[in-house]
């Protein structure tokens, strides 16, 4: 397992570099295993990356790509807060990916209504169905992540029950400190099944958490510290986010 850091002048250059790398990673996964399993993230950089992929759509063999989500806001299907809705606008409406290879999390006005726990369990079943027999989740090729100023990733917040989860792949979050409060999230054990984990982080408000996570903080306190890939962990930072790393 390796870990590396790349620093860029600004978030636009960061996103373009991440997008170019992801196009290559998808191609390599398809060549090696016949498919590419990618976990998407929301946030400014995550959605900008999807717009980059849309512009480079001809370089990707979409019939071989499966898309998952690291977390989702448990709001109605058409709510602008939905990561899925943002992903549709940025990418999915513009590429020819089979609908059964897009694996979104449930919405609050969907099959499970207000039952957040049932929605989380259902996504665990989605992951298991996409995994090798007997495995709880796939070995994702790339899990994309953003990070909050306190070090949260997906909807795993510091000192929360979700970040403490050690066995389940997906859990419900009903008291997120960042609105909306009700969410579904992949856990650290699910993230750690990924071959590669990429963290795209920009802005001066993230510098302390970046330094803590890379410096080996307890993931309970800084969840991003637990975002580790089986083969590679890649931090893609702008200069502001990297400002407090040792020189």
UniProtKB/Swiss-Prot annotation:
Sample GO molecular function, one term: 6-phosphogluconolactonase activity
| Keyword hit for Hydrolase | yes
Protein EC: 3.1.1.31
| Domain of life from the UniProt record | Bacteria
Record's Gene3D superfamilies? 3.40.50.1360
Q: Which reaction does it catalyse?
A: 6-phospho-D-glucono-1,5-lactone + H2O = 6-phospho-D-gluconate + H(+)
Question: Under the cellular component aspect of Gene Ontology, which terms does the record hold?
Answer: plasma membrane
PANTHER family for this protein? 6-PHOSPHOGLUCONOLACTONASE
Family designation? Belongs to the glucosamine/galactosamine-6-phosphate isomerase family. 6-phosphogluconolactonase subfamily.
What's the name of the protein?
A: 6-phosphogluconolactonase
The species this protein belongs to is Mycobacterium tuberculosis (strain ATCC 25618 / H37Rv)
Its gene is pgl
């Amino acid at each position: 397992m390796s870990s590396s850091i790349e620093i860029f002048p600004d978030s636009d250059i960061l996103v373009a570099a991440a997008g170019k790398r992801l196009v290559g990673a998808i191609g390599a996964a398809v060549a090696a295993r016949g498919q590419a399993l990618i976990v998407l993230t929301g946030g400014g950089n995550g959605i900008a990356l999807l717009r980059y992929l849309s512009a480079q759509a001809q370089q990707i063999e979409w019939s071989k790509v499966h898309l998952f989500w690291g977390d989702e806001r448990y709001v109605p299907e058409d709510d602008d807060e939905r990561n899925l809705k943002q992903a549709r606008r940025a990418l999915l409406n513009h590429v020819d990916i089979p609908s059964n290879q897009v694996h979104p999390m449930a919405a609050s006005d969907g099959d499970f209504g207000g039952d957040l726990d049932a929605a989380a369990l259902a996504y665990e079943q989605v992951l298991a169905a996409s995994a090798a027999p007997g495995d709880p989740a796939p070995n994702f090729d790339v899990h994309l992540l953003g990070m909050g100023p306190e070090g949260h990733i997906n909807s795993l917040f510091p000192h929360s029950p979700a970040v403490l989860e050690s066995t389940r792949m997906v859990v419900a979050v009903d008291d997120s400190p960042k609105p909306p409060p009700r969410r579904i999230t992949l856990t650290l054990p699910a993230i750690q099944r990924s071959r590669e984990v990429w963290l795209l982080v920009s802005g001066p408000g993230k510098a302390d958490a970046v330094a803590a996570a890379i410096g080996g903080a307890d993931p309970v306190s800084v969840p991003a510290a637990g975002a580790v890939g089986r083969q590679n962990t890649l931090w893609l930072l702008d200069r502001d986010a990297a400002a407090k790393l040792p020189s």
